[in-house]
Structure formats: C-alpha cells, structure tokens
Amino acid sequence: MAMSSFLINSNYVDPKFPPCEEYSQSDYLPSDHSPGYYAGGQRRESSFQPEAGFGRRSACTVQRYAACRDPGPPPPQPPPPPPPPPPGLSPRAPAQPPSGALLPEPGQRCEAISSSPPPPPCAQNPLHPSPSHSACKEPVVYPWMRKVHVSTVNPNYAGGEPKRSRTAYTRQQVLELEKEFHYNRYLTRRRRVEIAHALCLSERQIKIWFQNRRMKWKKDHKLPNTKIRSGGTAGSAGGPPGRPNGGPPAL
C-alpha cells in the first residue's frame, strides 16, 4: 500500500522501452511473448512476493544439490561399551585418603621404600620347616666329588685323594723322565724330589712312572719278574727225607 501511494504522489517518469523486435533480434528475450506482456510491468512490481519466489528456488536448489552430491564415507561407529564385570567381583574404587591426612612427598616416599629391610635370602616354608637350614648353606663337596686335573698338579701335592685319573704327561716331561731312566732305573728320595720340582709333577707321579717304566723294560728284555715267586721251586729242590731226588724209598 505504501508503494502504490509513493508511486502516485511522486513524479515518476515512465521509461521508454525499445520495441520488442529489437529484444528478440538481440536474444535478450524470447519472441513468443506479446507486447502486452511487458505493458503490465508496473502492476507486477506491486504484486511481487520475494519470499515465495525465494522459497521455491531454495527448495529446488536443495533437491538438485542433494541428487548430484556424491555420498561421502559413512560416519565412524562409536566404540562398544566395556564388558560388565563378573557377578562375583565388584569394581574397586581407588582408595581416597581421609580429609585430615597429609600425603607424603615423593622424596619421603622413596626414602621409606629404600629404608625397608630386604627379605631374607632363604625364607623357610612354614609347611615344611627345616631346622638345619640346609637350603641356605653351600653344598658339601666331598673328596670323591672333586675332579683332579693331573696335568697341572701342584708340586707341593702331598696326596690324600682316594681316586685319581690317568696322568697325561707332556712330551718334554716324558723326554726328561726317559733321560733319567737311561742312567738310573731306581731313584732315591732326594733325586725324586728334584725331578718332581723340575717337571712340575708330584713325587707320587714320578714314582708310578718309574715303576711302569721298569716293568716295560723287563718285558722288552724278557727278564723274569722278581715280584712273582713260584711255589714249586722250593719243592723240586729237595724232597722229603729218605727219598733222594724224589725217587722211591730205599728198601
């Protein structure tokens, strides 16, 4: 209403439009409209409703964009809820200190942990107590359980081991023992001690080596063994009285 009154009271000049043929030739407007279509332009301006026109246009554009737009990836699904606790157990809430208590500082907490005494190395089982504390003591090693390395025997070795393995002599030790056996097949105690210190062996090892070497020397030279005595030699030398040379008795 205000628009119509403004147009009537004001000195409005009606614009001069060119004929419709020029618009149709210049492709501004289609030629199927009559000249009377443009004559009522003033009346259309008063009855124009922009809200309705914009509403229809927005609906068309929304439908067109919705049809042309590519479907995007589906939204991520929310994570599944955590499983409920078993019926026998109830979730434990963190213990909260009382309001009046003071929390210890980190330094004091570390000192308290470090000052605690360590647990004993061998704790006794209350179900099976052992009065002798055999688990805490070191295992007892008896002489027969030790392994004797005879190749590196201490020269001050005094014996006492009930069981020994075979001695592996080196080439230098065997050469020195062969030289000594070539000159003396029997050794004195003093000479045996000297050879044992020189070859880093024990007196027992020197003694056993010379005994074995003498047995081998007698076997090579086919000499009788002096340690084995035959019991028939004494009986053949002389018979009982009255039987000379073991013959029948004289009548």
UniProtKB/Swiss-Prot annotation:
Protein's name in the database: Homeobox protein Hox-B4
Keywords: Developmental protein, DNA-binding, Homeobox, Nucleus, Phosphoprotein, Transcription, Transcription regulation
SMART domains (UniProt xref): HOX
DNA-binding region of this protein: 162-221
GO cellular-component term (any): nucleoplasm
One of the GO biological process terms: somatic stem cell division
Function statement: Sequence-specific transcription factor which is part of a developmental regulatory system that provides cells with specific positional identities on the anterior-posterior axis.
Residues with PTM Phosphoserine: S90
Residue ranges with Polar residues bias: 1-12
InterPro entries listed in its UniProt record: Antp_homeobox_Deformed_sf (IPR050609), HD (IPR001356), HD_metazoa (IPR020479), Homeobox_antennapedia (IPR017995), Homeobox_Antennapedia_CS (IPR001827), Homeobox_CS (IPR017970), Homeodomain-like_sf (IPR009057)
